[in-house]
Curated annotation (Swiss-Prot):
Keywords: Chloroplast, Membrane, Plastid, Plastid inner membrane, Transit peptide, Transmembrane, Transmembrane helix. Residues 101-103, 151-152, 198-205 are chloroplast intermembrane. GO terms for cellular component: chloroplast envelope; chloroplast inner membrane; chloroplast thylakoid membrane. The lineage of its organism: Eukaryota, Viridiplantae, Streptophyta, Embryophyta, Tracheophyta. Residues 1-76 form a transit peptide. It is a multi-pass membrane protein. This is Cold-regulated 413 inner membrane protein 2, chloroplastic. Induction: Accumulates at low levels in response to cold treatment. The gene is COR413IM2. Residues 77-79, 125-129, 174-176 are stromal.
Length: 226
């Protein structure tokens, strides 16, 4: 009976030891699973943030492209009517009027118009050393040789720009200069079209160059005033 008691105690102890070990080992998988769940939650948030950032970057990139397209259209359209281009159009028109035939205008009015609307580069060249030498040589040629009639007005325009005082040249690019230029242009246009008789005669083969030049000068003077 004593042996039975000892064996039963061992069996009981072993029987109680297994559940104790089993109960002690059970919480570990739960901790691991809980850790895995929390880790999965932490890993999911950065992916969501990165997706939101990519979406925001895509929207901002599209808005930037639209803004660049609009600004490129503006930059393409504005240089066509810049002040520099308008000055060159007026200068070419004035030179064409100086040499044009088939018009009844007083061409002497073209000289101050040229001085008021010529680009600053041309005015600086005329007032510089090269312009003074050109005027000096032209004056010597005019004194000792026969001077072509077509070159009289360009020579006078060169001398006018050289000897013009600062107070007179300072109205270039201002409202006073624009008003004076528009008045001269309208007077020349009135003379040209009134002496041409009809609009059809103004666009004849002999007068078409002067007509286009006068229209160009008048339109440019009006745009300068605006």
């Amino acid at each position: 009976m004593a042996s039975l008691c000892l064996s039963s105690s061992r069996i009981v102890s072993l029987h109680h030891q297994k559940p104790f070990l089993a109960l002690k080992l059970r919480p570990r998988p739960s901790n691991i699973s809980g850790l895995g769940h929390s880790t999965s939650v932490v890993c999911f948030n950065p992916l969501r943030l990165s997706a939101d950032r990519q979406r925001t970057a895509t929207v901002s990139a599209r808005a930037e492209k639209r803004r660049k397209r609009g600004s490129s259209v503006v930059c393409y359209a504005t240089p066509m009517l810049s002040v520099h281009n308008l000055q060159w159009i007026s200068t070419i028109s004035c030179v064409a009027l100086m040499f044009a035939r088939g018009t009844g205008i007083h061409k002497s009015f073209v000289v101050p118009l040229f001085a008021l609307q010529a680009p600053m580069g041309i005015v600086s060249w005329m007032k510089g050393e090269y312009g003074i030498w050109a005027a000096f040589l032209a004056l010597l040629t005019r004194l000792f040789f026969s001077f072509p009639v077509e070159l009289e007005l360009p020579f006078i325009a060169l001398l006018l720009v050289i000897v013009a005082p600062y107070q007179v040249m300072s109205i270039r690019g201002k409202q006073e200069g624009a008003i004076l230029s528009l008045a001269i242009s309208c007077f020349l246009a009135f003379q040209h079209f009134s002496r041409a008789g009809t609009l059809q005669k103004a666009f004849d083969q002999n007068s078409v160059l002067a007509t286009v030049a006068i229209i160009g000068v008048t339109v440019v003077s009006f745009l300068f005033l605006i």
